[in-house]
């Protein structure tokens, strides 16, 4: 079984369904941002986009700092769109996504397996959000369901006029925003291209979960994580070499290790490095 990493990317917007629950007007106060967000205008048109905006700062800053930013936003805007409680639920939901598993299939996932994945997502949403709050995911869920249904149609009829007629008939029953949505056309090719190896299958699963932009963001995070892991391995080996130098006193060893840490990592990463050192020292 394969685990799907949780997403930090920008997801499919909520659209008209979300407006049923939350007001369509919103405050325009500037938000606290990380350096990489300085030139990004926060999308406050829906709660989902605003949640993703705050979470996108994770990595440059810590979760507690982001939680403080959300609290400040809540206080300044009377809890419109999102509040601390909803943000906490969303973080828990994202963490649960990291534990979601897929069956390993050499030829890619079947339509039934994609449908099971879809149902697993609905179950997770129901676990962490109220019925009203689940409007956060309404458009994304419907688009995913349609993409899987389109896959089923073309599996049944092949690339034929009959398949095209069946698909068009299904689309006609959908709301206008679904029919117009480019996400429908963008999601299906990713779903129907059965995974060619582990990397692509993972990418397809992420597209189903978080959309194209989210999948790309996760791929970037994979690269960043791999870079960090290699950086830590290099650091840990150099640290080990310092610790076996008997001519150095314990104080001198710690001084050199601290200098080594400063060369490899930013100060905000040091607590994480401490934890990783302890785990590795204990053979975990």
Curated annotation (Swiss-Prot):
UniProt keyword terms in alphabetical order: Cell inner membrane, Cell membrane, Chaperone, Lipid degradation, Lipid metabolism, Membrane, Transmembrane, Transmembrane helix
Membrane-protein topology: Single-pass membrane protein
Annotated Pfam families: Lipase_chap
Subcellular location as annotated: Cell inner membrane
Major localisation: membrane
Protein name per its UniProtKB record: Lipase chaperone
Homology family: Belongs to the lipase chaperone family.
BP term (GO), one: protein folding
Keyword Transmembrane helix included in the entry's annotation: yes
Known function: May be involved in the folding of the extracellular lipase during its passage through the periplasm.
Gene Ontology cellular component list: plasma membrane
Residues of the signal peptide: none
Annotated GO MF terms: unfolded protein binding
Superkingdom of this protein's organism: Bacteria
Organism of provenance: Vibrio cholerae serotype O1 (strain ATCC 39315 / El Tor Inaba N16961)
Listed transmembrane segments: 4-24
InterPro entries attached to this UniProt entry: Lipase_chaperone
